[in-house]
Amino acid sequence: MRRGQVQKMKRTGSTSLGLVFLTAMLISMRTPIQTVYADEEPITLRVCSWEEYIDLGGWDADEAIALDNGSVIFGERPLYEEFEDWYRETYGREVRVEYSCFGTNEDLYNQLNMGDTYDLVCPSEYMIMKLIAEDKLLPYSQDFYDESDENNYYINNVSPYIRETLETNEIHGESWSKYAAGYMWGITGVLYNPEYVTEEEASTWEIFGNPKFNRQVTLKDNVRDSYFAALGILKADELTDEDFIRSADYHEHLADMMNDVSPETIEAAQNLLDDLMDNVYSLETDSGKADMITGKIVANYQWSGDAVYAMDQADADDFELKFAVPKESTNLWFDGWVMLKSGINGSRDRQHAAEAFVNFVSRTDNAVRNMYYIGYTSSIAGNEEDDTVYEYMKWCYGAGEDDEDIIEYPVGYFFSGDNSDKNYMLETVSSQIGRQLYSQYPPEDIMNRTAVMRYFDDDANKAINQMWINVRCFDINDVPTGVWMAILAVMLVMVWMFYRKSKSKRT
């Protein structure tokens, strides 16, 4: 959780609680009440998302965020509770949110298969693809995409970059945007300690096999992330070839290469990962951040949001960590809101409430609350009339009056779709390159070499999962014949002894 971790980078200022609550009241009054024609029974909306992935409120008074555009951001109560009030005030109908959490995408999938029922869930891109392929998701309504509706905060505020990503990627001929609304997004890379690791050394997936850092680096303890890193190493020469990078169909070929699950590639990846296991300190899911902060390791495969958290923590302890993006390619990931057919079950009321919930958390002030609370980057950018998200980025990373070595950092690709847009040319200190800003809003040249990991079919999933079992445990195919013969001999002796013992009892 990111709250309170970036104080050194924030602009100073004071805000009275009266202004905070006045602003909150004005926000809640800025839209007219509409009526949903349905029964008057309260709607129960069942939402399931990641743990600590939404603002739970309870902010201290001095945490109020005063932005240069006049907005004041303050988290008093959990957002899902505030949604209930907003829905009643906006649509004249009671809704009750049952909010629960899951630990991993696979946990969520298993919960659904075991009979748990939810209306709205927030899995990662590959699980969204799997649920689409299995016909478990309900498309968003046409009303949800109506840009003339001022309450449709999602379609009016989503980043052009995220919107294009969702619209241009397909599964079974249908775009992701038909079923998914972006929530948080990021990339993967290498969190490193610059005292021991150079930027060049950290800017390649090959760092995990670099003997210089034997037992000082960690990989992720999940097959998709580690397989991606392995592909980056196996295909490094082609991925960094200038002719390949300049080719007209570069992005299509890049995606194909970073999703190669041919038997030959899986076998090569297993052999490589076997070698990497001799060099890494461990496989980890969450402990890598703490290990970097305590100095147990010097480099760590990391998601951009967790990298920001670790850098914030290190700053608080007066030492520096940095984030590098491998030159070969990086994984673009996102988590998105999707509606389940089994939960909505044909109910117009529940679908309307689910879509309204997505819109509510996509309001720019709420997007800022979530980013501040959890430390990840929202898919919401705002628009020409509402620059709250951009102002929050300035509040976090903008250069102060006394700062030196100031640079222009373009982020137009995310906010307007034009990276040369002068309205989104952030003035920041040069030290932010490779730091928090760089992690949350990577430069466009890095985004150009991202690839989304696709949903793999059952056969491919089975193959790479078996590969991962072989890597994490052992591959029975690698056991020498002599060992198998010794095991067989021991088993035969045990059977013979059991037979002798049974025979002696009968006599």
Question: Predicted regions span which residues?
Answer:
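Conserved C-terminal helix/tail region of periplasmic/extracytoplasmic solute-binding proteins
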Residues: 416-507
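Mature extracytoplasmic/periplasmic domains
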Residues: 339-441, 492-493
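Short loop->beta-strand "edge-of-pocket" segments that line small-molecule binding or catalytic clefts
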Residues: 207-223
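Periplasmic-binding protein-like
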Residues: 146-152, 270-274, 317-341
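Early extracytoplasmic/lumenal segment of secretory-pathway proteins
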Residues: 40-130, 134
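Hinge/lid segment of periplasmic solute-binding proteins
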Residues: 94, 103-109, 129-185, 199-206
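Ligand-binding pocket segment of bilobal, Venus flytrap-like solute-binding proteins
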Residues: 219, 226-230, 238-322
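Sec-dependent signal peptide cleavage junction
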Residues: 29-40
